[in-house]
Amino acid sequence: MLSQSEVYVFEADKMIQGFVGLNDEYIEGIFVSDGMQSCGIGKLLLDYIKDKKERLQLNVYQKNARAISFYQREGFIIQCEGLDEATGEKEYTMLWKQK
């Protein structure tokens, strides 16, 4: 999944606590360790890549209401819905553009 991606990490106490994978303008994923969620790490990672890009795109499962809410707070807009063929899960494609 992340083989051709740029990966940026967040470290705390000499341990990786989160990372984001970016393939051009597409966010492959943002991951934060369970014990560090809701501490602002995801926002820090997202802000870092927002500074590098004019626009960003991602897919998120429709059932992941927490992630959808996070991305909407960060300025992402739902563009369309689709189906992840690998999992059969319904998903949204979301887009963010630099203002």
Model-derived features with residue positions:
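Conserved donor-binding loop and adjoining core beta-sheet/short helix segment
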Residues: 20-28
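Conserved acetyl-CoA-binding loop-helix of GNAT-fold acetyltransferases
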Residues: 38-51, 69-73
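A short, internal acetyl-CoA/4′-phosphopantetheine-binding micro-motif in the GNAT/acyltransferase core
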Residues: 27-37, 60-61
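Conserved GNAT acetyl-CoA-binding A-motif
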Residues: 51-63
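Conserved acetyl-CoA-binding loop of GNAT-fold acetyltransferases
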Residues: 72-80
